[in-house]
């Protein structure tokens, strides 16, 4: 299995020594997202940036893995909301990187479905262990469960 996207940037007039960081990301499904660098790196704060995209990818992967595990356990999820945070810092090598990701999911189960904290933690642990995007990142990812 493989995935492909197309990232397109087109030069445009800019002050001497500057360049426009806005670009388009086209996904295999045909959907397009307007993107830029983060505002801290002279990007457009109205567009998605790579750091947010990475954070959304790991959050989405964890959620979908969690939902699969819950479904297999016949635990009907009514709502799942995550407000993840990514921290940028310097690695030991001196390179700037996303050094810590904290997922902060809140899960609401369907009426009549009671899940204790221990079971919820186990499902999140299993989801994290099986999320291939989390497994692809070398740095620290934490799951802080909102109960």
Identify what each model region corresponds to.
Residues 61-62:
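Alpha-helical metal-binding/catalytic segments enriched in His/Glu/Asp
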Residues 1-56, 67-147:
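Extended beta-strand/beta-hairpin segments
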């Amino acid at each position: 299995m493989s995935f492909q996207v197309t990232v397109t940037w087109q030069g445009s007039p800019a002050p001497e020594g500057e360049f426009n960081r806005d670009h388009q990301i086209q996904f295999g499904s045909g959907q397009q997202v307007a993107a830029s660098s983060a505002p801290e790196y002279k990007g457009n704060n109205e567009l998605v940036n790579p750091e947010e995209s990475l954070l959304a990818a790991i959050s989405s992967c964890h959620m979908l893995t969690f939902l699969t595990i819950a479904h297999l356990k016949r635990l009907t999820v009514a709502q799942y909301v995550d407000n993840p945070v990514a921290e940028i810092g310097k690695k030991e090598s001196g390179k700037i990187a996303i050094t810590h990701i904290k997922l902060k999911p809140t899960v609401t189960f369907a009426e009549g479905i009671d899940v204790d904290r221990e079971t919820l933690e186990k499902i999140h642990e299993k989801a994290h262990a099986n999320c291939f995007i989390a497994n692809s990142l070398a740095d620290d990812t934490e799951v802080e469960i909102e109960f």
